[in-house]
């Protein structure tokens, strides 16, 4: 399973990249706003940090012709750009056209298995089901991941399932259990995966016992 960082903050991405925990990056208009940076400038900088992984940059347009124009600008930033598109009629149309051009695409804001099926038919590189946002509406987001996995396996679709809207460490576990290809994770959640109270308690116990031995390793 691959881990993408859901962030447009250079410092956050760099810190995780140094631990070899980053397989890619996803951004969206909200994250760009939070960064306070120009989308083209910050996206180019991110692409230099994650040379071997895709970086999703989202169009702001909603009409086909405008989507294609913005996609051309974003695709020109770097070879590892993945064009993020809304899961709408025009978004699907653009996905088909961009895929034909050999560009990577990420259809976002997926909330149903039917939408995911259409994304695969359109040749999307990634489909982004929003797990946490479904949970907010009282719908189990992990169930959607399982449904999409089943459909994609049934028909050998190559579109990768990119679990998005990850709010908790449990969402990451659910994504892995469902067979999602990728989870895009906020930096705070990714770091939280490392922690467990029993690990910390056990380490403290070992350190206390080690002091009692009076030894030094180096």
From Swiss-Prot:
The lineage is: Bacteria, Pseudomonadati, Pseudomonadota, Alphaproteobacteria, Hyphomicrobiales
Q: Does the keyword Protease apply?
A: no
Which protein are we looking at?
Answer: Probable transaldolase
Q: Name one GO biological process term.
A: pentose-phosphate shunt
Which organism's genome codes for this protein? Bartonella henselae (strain ATCC 49882 / DSM 28221 / CCUG 30454 / Houston 1) (Rochalimaea henselae)
UniProt gene name: tal
Q: What class of enzyme is it?
A: transferase
User: Which CDD domains does this one have?
Assistant: Transaldolase_FSA (cd00956)
Recorded catalytic reaction(s): these are: D-sedoheptulose 7-phosphate + D-glyceraldehyde 3-phosphate = D-erythrose 4-phosphate + beta-D-fructose 6-phosphate
Give the pathway. Carbohydrate degradation; pentose phosphate pathway; D-glyceraldehyde 3-phosphate and beta-D-fructose 6-phosphate from D-ribose 5-phosphate and D-xylulose 5-phosphate (non-oxidative stage): step 2/3
